Design a protein with these regions (language model features):
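C-terminal effector-binding regulatory domain of bacterial HTH transcription factors
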Residues: 1-3, 70, 123, 251-260, ...
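Short helix-boundary/capping micro-motifs
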Residues: 14-30
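Residues within the DNA-recognition helix of helix-turn-helix
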Residues: 32, 39-42, 113
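A short LG(V/I)-centered, amphipathic sequence patch enriched
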Residues: 44-63
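Short helix-loop hinge/linker segments at domain boundaries
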Residues: 56-59, 66, 77-100
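Central regulatory/effector-binding core of bacterial HTH transcription factors
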Residues: 95-159
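Acidic, Gly/Pro-rich loop/turn segments at junctions of secondary structure
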Residues: 130-207, 211-228
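Hydrophobic hinge/microswitch elements
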Residues: 219-265, 272
Length: 318
């Protein structure tokens, strides 16, 4: 088969981009490195242009390679989805469900839920991925896999082609460790942050908070020094080590620490506006019984959890 028409060769190409290594891509796809190298050379020969700049074992995408990657990933995703639909019986409670979640909530909340669901339906298999882009783009992983279900936040804009199940409101808590507050004092107003270190979270699915509200008032945030991290786990680790103040820690990630007072709320009610939390599914995926049953089940489970948080921390829902 012509390499241009061979999707397995294109999948090898995307795997090399993802792993940044021909050998790692070969291992992932169970291909001999020599064969993988030959397939890649054949593909470039048929294209008439290089996909990679080769420097020893290092491979860097050419500008054409970047363009090819962006165009082929959706094609491979559609191919994978078509195969799954052809293989699967929509009415049966068996088969795979591919799930994507916000970084950080998987180990604490989602993994236990998947295990619980598999006890009820042992023929269901799960793949859990980390959300790397806002929805709906986030349904497709960097490897080109299309996910069935996503758990995350939603603004007011509707998502076309997406089924949504509301779970609850997520408050964001400005907080710091007692260790930090004992050394640096307690900020009571956003203006006080000029004397403090801000631990700021910036990721593919959220930007760093630069403004807080309190009732009808709002105020910009400015810090003496900043520590920027790219996921909630790193932010929480820095927070507990006394590195500074997180102005927007989701209550989900700090409720236990607030209970045992290893984290203390600051800024006297100033906060980032809360966000609505949802379980999402692509309409095509939701048409499968296993996906619809799972989505409705986990959405109800998440709602119970959010209701418990609201009852225990009513002060953050005013």
């Amino acid at each position: 088969m012509d390499r241009l028409d061979d999707l397995s060769t294109w999948r090898l190409f995307t795997e090399i981009v993802r792993t940044e290594s021909l050998h790692a891509a070969s291992d992932a796809l169970a291909i001999e490195p020599s064969s993988a190298s030959r397939f890649l050379r054949d593909l470039e020969k048929r294209l008439g242009i290089a996909l990679f700049i080769r420097q020893g074992r290092s491979l860097q995408l050419t500008s054409f390679g970047k363009e090819a990657y962006e165009k082929i990933v959706p094609v491979l995703a559609l191919h994978q989805e078509a195969l799954e639909n052809l293989r699967g019986d929509r009415a049966r409670m068996e088969g795979s469900i591919r799930l994507v979640t916000i970084a950080g909530i998987g180990p604490a909340e989602i993994t236990p839920a998947l295990i619980e669901f598999q006890k009820i339906y042992p023929d269901i298999q799960f793949e859990l991925h980390e959300l790397r882009a806002p929805l709906p783009q986030g349904f497709t992983t960097p490897e080109g896999l299309v996910c069935d279900v996503a758990i995350g936040y939603k603004n007011q804009d509707p998502l076309p082609g997406i089924v949504s199940r509301y779970s609850g409101e997520m408050p964001f808590i400005p907080c710091a460790s007692p260790l930090y507050l004992k050394k640096h004092g307690i900020p009571r107003h956003p203006h006080d942050c000029l004397k403090h270190t801000g631990i700021l979270i910036s990721s593919p699915t959220r930007s760093a908070t630069t403004r807080l509200v309190c009732g009808e008032q709002s105020a910009d945030l400015h810090w003496k020094t900043r520590l920027e991290v790219h996921n909630l786990i790193s932010a929480k680790s820095a927070l507990l080590l006394g590195a500074g103040i997180v102005p927007d820690m989701p209550l989900f990630h700090c409720h236990q620490e607030l209970r045992n007072q290893t984290l203390i709320p600051v800024l006297n009610g100033w906060h980032r506006p809360s966000t609505s939390s949802y379980v999402f599914a692509r309409e095509e995926a939701y048409a499968k019984r296993r996906v619809s049953v799972f989505v409705d089940w986990i959405a109800e489970r998440e709602k119970r959890f959010f209701d418990e948080l609201r009852a225990d921390f009513a002060q953050f829902y005013l």
